[in-house]
Amino acid sequence: MINFDYRCLTGEVITKEDFEYEEERKAWNRAIEKYPLVIVYCKTEDDIRNAIIFAKNNSLSIRIRSGRHHYEGYSTGNDIVVIDVSKMNKIYIDEKNETVKVQGGTRNRELYKAVGKKGYPFPGGGCPSVGVVAFTLGGGWGYSSRLLGLGCDRLVEAELID
């Protein structure tokens, strides 16, 4: 077994040796049993960059996780680096331009609450625990799609981290 040096990782780092690993590795679909090498809960873009660099330097695959809500478990895997952005869930509402900016970990329930307070609709899905970014990148079909269009129809801009 290879010993990895996790000291270059920032954010909250969970490895197989940590007490909370067993609970933190689980997906929404409890039938998915995957065992990632490390889970990095990112709070900043630098945390994400450091996790990507760690994975690249160690020839490890990565998965991005925001809500753990995927039927097939694509946000996790065996012996990989899980970059979890669920703690990056800030929402910025620009009423002048009628736009909303969300961080990668924002979930439907958080966005519905924020825009609902301002009287705005969001063409999100019916499950509150689904991540908004994953929902949108998957096309974004929801109960209000006939009225508001798909979630991806409302995407104005995306920022990627390399």
Model-based region annotation:
Residues 1-148:
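N-terminal accessory segments
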Residues 91, 150-162:
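Active-site and channel-lining beta-strand-loop segments
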